[in-house]
UniProtKB/Swiss-Prot annotation:
One annotated Gene Ontology cellular component of this protein: mitochondrion
Subcellular location: Mitochondrion
Highest taxon listed in the record's lineage: Eukaryota
Keyword Cell membrane in annotation: no
Entry keywords, A to Z: Mitochondrion, Transit peptide
Major localization class: mitochondrion
Protein known as: Protein pet117, mitochondrial
């Protein structure tokens, strides 16, 4: 075999090994990115659930406080508490 053919075979082998290595590493990186995406989605869902629970608590507190304090609406539709004074 000539030197040129030997170099061609070695070059093809090196190129093949490099391509297998490159594709393998690329798959690992993509798998990590997909896993990170799932973790971010789980975190977003957790935050959304916490915010929804906070909203529900705030709505319950508002109903409770409005039932305890007399509330009126003025001409602009704004809510105001009426001041009640106790005279002894």
């Amino acid at each position: 075999m000539s030197t040129a053919s030997k170099l061609c075979i070695v070059g093809a082998g090196v190129f093949s090994v490099y391509m297998v290595y490159f594709v393998h590493n690329n798959q690992i990186i993509e798998r990590e990115k997909m896993s990170a995406g799932v973790q971010k989605d789980d975190e977003r869902k957790r935050i959304k659930k916490e915010r929804f629970e906070d909203l529900k608590r705030q709505q319950e507190l508002r109903k409770f406080y409005e039932s305890q304090l007399p509330v009126e609406e003025d001409e602009k539709g704004l809510r105001q508490t009426t001041q009640t004074t106790v005279n002894d």
